[in-house]
Amino acid sequence: MADSEHRAADDGGAGAAGAPRTAGVVGLGLIGGSFARAYRAAGWRVLAFDTDADTFDAACVETVAGGLDESTIPLCDIIVLAANPAACVEWLRTHAEALGACSDPAAGTGPLVIDTAGVKARVCDEAFDIARTHGFAFCGTHPMAGTEHSGFAHSTATLFQGQPMVLVPPPLDDIERLMLLDRTKELLEPCGFGKFSVTDAATHDRVIGFTSQLCHVVSNAYVKSPTAQEHHGFSAGSYKDLTRVAHLNPRMWSELMVANADNLVFELDTIIGNLGAYRDALAAGDTGELEGLLAEGDRIKRALDDAADGQGNR
């Protein structure tokens, strides 16, 4: 048993009769590990599961109090599925009966289950049906936070502080939907998220194809230039900004991108077309055309920043 299991929880994690609230975490990588650390820092008890025994043992040193399985699922206030989309769905299928047996979504009892996968349709299309059939609460989520690193060793309790969180609730009537969203936000308070956005799975995946997946593809492709081998001493902020996410987890990102292929292909076609216009202007030596293209991009970026400033989102 980890030492953390014996430590008294602070008041911030106290539940009924002063007992610590409990968070379950499936997958102790960067995201799952950061959820585990955030809840532990807030005084919650953390139960977890990871397929890698060494990772689980490392997490038990100071963060995780014990294992998450069918016997401990009923102890949880929230369960965070921080795994790839297929693994999230499989975990739900495997544990659906245990979740349903201890839950009454209308009364707000039993664990709230969320997933953190980077694509939502792949998970939510099945998860909503599983949760409805077995009678437990589920809400899709996507924390808009991360680093170029991966693994529990790089997780931190402050990763989500002030960062946006996207919520994707199931199709419910207005009252049930509001109750689920309020419950989700309340249970996520220890993580310190900033703005919450609510959307549907299709919209999430369409936008994330542009704001995240396209960025990773462009960054990853950019460093394949042979000139990259000579960048030392010639690069500064622009190079660093553009290449930060070239370093990624290929297996995880390939699954996310293939699951969102239609949206990502559209964005790739769009940027390839735009790049072609710059190339054609350069090849033709057309300074006026190139200046116009650059001015257009500058104007669009300024308008986007102004709009973000107006909403307090920059």
Question: Which residue ranges define each predicted feature?
Answer:
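Phosphate-coordination loops involved in phosphoryl transfer and adenosine-cofactor binding
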Residues: 19-22, 110, 162
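Rossmann-like NAD(P)(H) cofactor-binding subdomain of soluble oxidoreductases
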Residues: 94-153
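Interdomain hinge/lid region at the active-site interface
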Residues: 230-301
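Glycine-rich, N-terminal phosphate-binding loop of Rossmann-like dinucleotide-binding domains
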Residues: 82-84, 117, 169
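NAD(P)+-binding Rossmann beta1-loop-alpha1 motif at the extreme N-terminus of oxidoreductases
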Residues: 2-74, 78
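Internal alpha-helical scaffold of NAD(P)-dependent oxidoreductase catalytic cores
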Residues: 157-244
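Rossmann-like NAD(P)-binding element
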Residues: 70-108, 112
